UniProtKB/Swiss-Prot annotation:
Name of the protein described by the UniProt record: Large ribosomal subunit protein bL9
GO cellular component, one term: ribonucleoprotein complex
InterPro entries (alphabetical): Ribosomal_bL9 (IPR000244), Ribosomal_bL9/RNase_H1_N (IPR009027), Ribosomal_bL9_bac/chp (IPR020594), Ribosomal_bL9_C (IPR020069), Ribosomal_bL9_C_sf (IPR036791), Ribosomal_bL9_N (IPR020070), Ribosomal_bL9_N_sf (IPR036935)
UniProt GO BP: translation
Record function comment: Binds to the 23S rRNA.
Family: Belongs to the bacterial ribosomal protein bL9 family.
Species of origin: Shewanella pealeana (strain ATCC 700345 / ANG-SQ1)
Keywords: Ribonucleoprotein, Ribosomal protein, RNA-binding, rRNA-binding
Gene name of the encoded protein: rplI
One Gene Ontology term of the molecular function aspect: rRNA binding
């Protein structure tokens, strides 16, 4: 099924690209979320009329994401206290949700889906640098300090 993208979508394309996707992906995700329209002549004309508005919205989203990334990078080390054994091994682990909650408590809104932990959850005490992807083009680094609870 051919669709015209109304938003930038990772691993698929940018605004205005006409791409071929599987029918189920289009019907169940792209079309209901408003991220694409079916590629036909009527929709192409409507899209070209709305193109400037959509590009302005995309630029505004990128600017807002850049500001959030600067705020996140400007944060001092975010401290998370967790129960730990004698050798610094945590009882449990610290995952995306815990990091997102700690950053939000520090004053910058962050969703758990934006936190990237490629090596999995954190299981020891210490200092860590966690990558946060606030936009498809914008990344930031959060300094995280995991300490043992007293």
């Amino acid at each position: 099924m051919n669709v015209i993208l109304l938003d930038k979508i990772a691993n698929l394309g940018n605004l205005g690209d006409q791409v071929s996707v599987k029918a189920g992906y289009a019907r169940n995700f792209l079309l209901p979320q408003g991220k694409a329209v079916v590629a036909n002549t009527a929709n192409t004309e409507v899209f070209e009329a709305r193109r400037a508005d959509l590009e302005a919205k995309l630029a505004a989203d990128l600017a807002a994401a850049t500001q959030r990334a600067e705020k996140i990078s400007a944060l001092e080390s975010v401290v998370i206290a967790s129960k730990a054994g004698d050798e610094g091994k945590l009882f449990g682990s610290i995952g995306n949700r815990d990091i997102a909650d700690a950053v939000t408590a520090a004053g910058v809104e962050l969703a758990k889906s934006e936190v990237r932990l490629p090596l999995g959850a954190i299981r020891t005490t210490g200092e860590f640098e966690v990558e946060v992807q606030v936009h498809t083009e914008v990344k930031a680094i959060v300094k995280l300090s995991v300490v043992a609870e007293a």
